Regions:
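A cross-family phosphate/adenosyl-ligand binding-site feature
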Residues: 1-60, 71, 191-199, 205-216, ...
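Conserved small/polar residues in nucleotide/adenosyl-binding loops
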Residues: 313-319
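Active-site histidine-anchored catalytic micro-motif
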Residues: 1-132, 140, 156, 179
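Structural motif
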Residues: 24-26, 62-65, 85-91, 130-134, ...
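A short beta-alpha structural unit
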Residues: 237-244
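Flexible loop/turn connectors
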Residues: 251, 255-264
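Accessory alpha-helical/coil subdomains and C-terminal extensions
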Residues: 55, 63-68, 74-78, 83, ...
Length: 323
């Protein structure tokens, strides 16, 4: 832990109009600094959670507002419980996979970016008679792919919660051809598995293994069957840095006001959520560590079926992995 403590003091100037228009986080925080995770340093294993708690106590802060997804909220639940720290959580993840929460900060913007990407890919797909594949983020939840796929007019939408076959995709492309279409748009979530059941992953130089590569796999397999020229676009971190949509700005503002009100009322260990067109709060234990994937009864699944984005009626949507 740095001494003196490395902090950013919040003041009215931090919250002038420009901040609302920015993507990312000016705090520079992420969920990779899990203090409970054993880190090997000079051959020793270290649990730095006590240092984090000590640093928090030194700052003499009355309460902590934690902003993040299910992973961040789980870490914060553990650290605040151990340190007896007053805590309120706010869901922020483009994956939109926080349990009991309809909309997380960042999600609407990510869907907008993916939709715009499909809008831009369609003309070049038509011009050059290609099958264009767009790989989007979302981890184990298919919310971005499903929503952007419908809004962007994708011909095939693939999400982790739904099993598929390369043959069904190839048949769909051939069907489009028979109707005079010379191109197709496919959107696929990064956690969609290969037909053998394995996830597509990429190993980085630092040894970290992350989701990625399913788009290229699909492109190769589709080409083998249909002889269609395929091109793959991996949208990646573009989804995380765009200018926030009006909906994200509204939700973030509403979450912030509600979280401060909870602290003023001394209601701690709560998470604010967006539900039934407004802000509510739930116990932290109801949310932290759980995920929200696309459900079998999601009305957008029916929309995707009706639009003919591969025949979902012949596929199996397994029971959600969420608790």
């Amino acid at each position: 832990l740095k001494e003196p403590l490395d902090v950013i003091k919040l003041n009215p100037q931090n919250f002038e109009g420009s901040l609302m228009r920015m993507g990312g986080t000016f705090l520079g925080s992420n969920n990779k600094g899990n203090p409970f995770k054993k880190i090997i340093r000079n051959g020793k294993k270290i649990d730095s959670s006590d240092l984090v708690i000590e640093g928090f106590k030194k700052l003499e802060i009355d309460a902590l507002i934690g902003i993040g997804g299910d992973g961040s909220l789980k870490i914060l639940q553990s650290i605040t419980k151990k340190g007896n720290i007053n805590f309120v959580g706010i869901p922020k993840t483009i994956d939109n996979d926080v349990k009991h929460n309809e909309l997380s900060i960042g999600y609407d913007t990510a869907v907008d970016v993916a939709t715009n990407a499909l809008d831009m890919l369609q003309p070049t797909a038509a011009s050059h008679r290609r099958v264009m594949i767009l790989e989007v983020m979302g981890r184990d939840a298919g919310h971005i792919a499903l929503n952007a796929g419908i809004a962007g007019g994708a011909d095939v939408i693939l999400i982790p919660e739904i099993q598929y076959s390369i043959k069904s995709i190839a048949d769909h492309i051939e069907k489009l051809r028979s109707k005079g279409r010379n191109h197709a748009l496919i959107v696929v979530a990064e956690a969609v598995k290969k037909e053998n059941g394995k996830k597509a992953t990429v190993k980085y130089v630092d040894g970290e293994v992350r989701l990625g590569g399913i788009g290229n796999y699909l492109g190769d397999e589709i080409y083998k069957i249909t002889d269609s020229e395929t091109r793959v676009t991996v949208l990646g971190h573009v989804q995380r840095g765009a200018q926030p949509t009006h909906r994200d700005r509204l939700i973030a503002s509403a979450f912030g006001v509600y979280a401060v009100d909870l602290i003023a009322k001394k209601k701690f260990n709560r998470v604010v959520v967006w539900k039934d067109r407004g802000v509510q709060d739930l116990m932290l234990s109801q949310v932290a560590g759980y995920s929200k994937t696309v459900q079998k009864n999601d009305p957008l699944i029916k929309v995707a079926e009706g639009l003919g984005t591969v025949s979902y009626t012949h596929l199996t949507l397994p029971t959600s992995r969420s608790v």
